[in-house]
Amino acid sequence: MDAVTDTPVTEMPAPFVFTDAAADKVKELIEEEGNPELKLRVFVQGGGCSGFQYGFTFDEAINEDDTVMNKSGVQLLIDSMSYQYLVGAEIDYKDDINGAQFVIKNPNATTTCGCGSSFSV
């Protein structure tokens, strides 16, 4: 309840899911880098066999158009252009028989390539 208007407050669902496994791995990588100011930037760019591909990098700066998500002490940054392609996506980290990697499950992708690193909408 909003104390001022006495109306129910509806919380907006997070625009993406950043799993505990992904946050834990990012935290581990940041600790290895020795720079607690680092944040994980996830982005979409043109390329790959399906038209778009995902990218991951560390960044110290939060840009004006970034959406910031906090999870387990880790900040995830997504720029406004990439945001539109990632709404509803799950960003996870898998370590299995196929290897260790960050994985994005994206409901907006209409097709993906065989390796899963590029997609189209």
From Swiss-Prot:
Say if the entry is tagged with keyword Transport. Answer: no
Identify the gene encoding this protein.
erpA
* Role description: Required for insertion of 4Fe-4S clusters.
- Protein name as it appears in the record: Putative iron-sulfur cluster insertion protein ErpA
Ordered alphabetically, the record's keywords are: Iron, Iron-sulfur, Metal-binding
Cofactor dependence is on: iron-sulfur cluster
Q: Entry cofactor note text? A: Binds 1 iron-sulfur cluster per subunit.
Task: Give any GO molecular function from the UniProt entry.
Answer: iron ion binding
* Database matches in SUPFAM superfamilies: HesB-like domain
Return one Gene Ontology term, BP aspect: iron-sulfur cluster assembly
Tell me the residue numbers annotated for binding iron-sulfur cluster. Answer: C49, C113, C115
Q: Does the keyword RNA-binding apply?
A: no
Q: Which organism encodes this protein? A: Paraburkholderia phymatum (strain DSM 17167 / CIP 108236 / LMG 21445 / STM815) (Burkholderia phymatum)
Q: Which Gene3D superfamilies match?
A: HesB-like domain (2.60.300.12)
**One Pfam assignment:** Fe-S_biosyn
Q: Which family does it belong to?
A: Belongs to the HesB/IscA family.
Assembly and binders: Homodimer.
